[in-house]
Every structure is written in structure tokens, then in C-alpha cells.
Amino acid sequence: MLTLLKIRNLALVDELAWELGSGLISVTGETGAGKSVIVGALKMILGERADKGLIRTGEDTCTIESVFDLKDASEINAILEEGGLEACEDTQIIIRRSIGTTANRQFINDSPVTLTLLKKVGERLVDSCRYSRYTRYICTHQCTHTYKHKTKTSAGAW
């Protein structure tokens, strides 16, 4: 579970430290308030390629840091050990990325890692789904089962 997200010099965000509690978290706000910046930061911390154009105007680097509390670190530890890193001693993992105009660096528990390894770890930390895809699936599923046998023409279309 993500417990802390820190963002510095990313797009319109000068500095943000967001401690997340347990339970459902909803991010809402006006257009341009920074919701997409937060989602983008989370994607980058999980291994997505960084766009240098997102570095805050007038700055050379942006930094994103996250803390995840793990219920079971065995799967993450296996990936870390496979990548030549020490296993997590406790059930917490700290990921940090520094995106610069000349170079990007990423760290897991203060050890430098490749983007490939970061992505492998990131895939195990977060399950993401998009509202639009989920809605499309639900709509398609309901339409298929509700209207499939109503008419001969629609039955052929399914």
C-alpha cells in the first residue's frame, strides 16, 4: 500500500508531500489542479519512462519519492535478489526517481537500479485499472447479455 508520495519540481508542483491513509482515496479537483501530475508521478515511480519536459520550468531536476508498506515482501524480495539487491529487511520499500535534463536515476531502498528492475517491482506494487476501460467492459457485457437474443440482426452482430 502506498503510504507516502513526495514530488518536487514536477510540472506545476514545486513541492508536495502526501501521506496516504488506508482505505479508499479519491483525488478530485478543478481542471488544471494537478491530478494528472500526481498520477504521472506515480506512474514514473513505478517504472514508466520519464519525460524531461515535465521538469518544472527553471529547474534542472525533479524528484519523486514513494514509500510502500508491504503485507508480504516475499515476491518483491525475489525480484530484488534476482536484480542483485538485498531483500527488504522490513515490510517497507522506498522508491526514488530523479529526472534530470541530462540523466535519470532510480533507487530502491537507496540502491541504484535499472529502469527495467524498477518496472518489475512496480508491476507487483500496484494494480491499476482505468475507469473508461472498466466502464466499456461493463457496458459491452451488459449489452451483450441483455440484447443478444432480442432480434435476429443484433444476435448476428454479437
Give the predicted meaning of each segment.
Residues 3-142, 152-158:
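Gly/Lys-enriched N-terminal cap/neck module of very large, oligomeric protein machines
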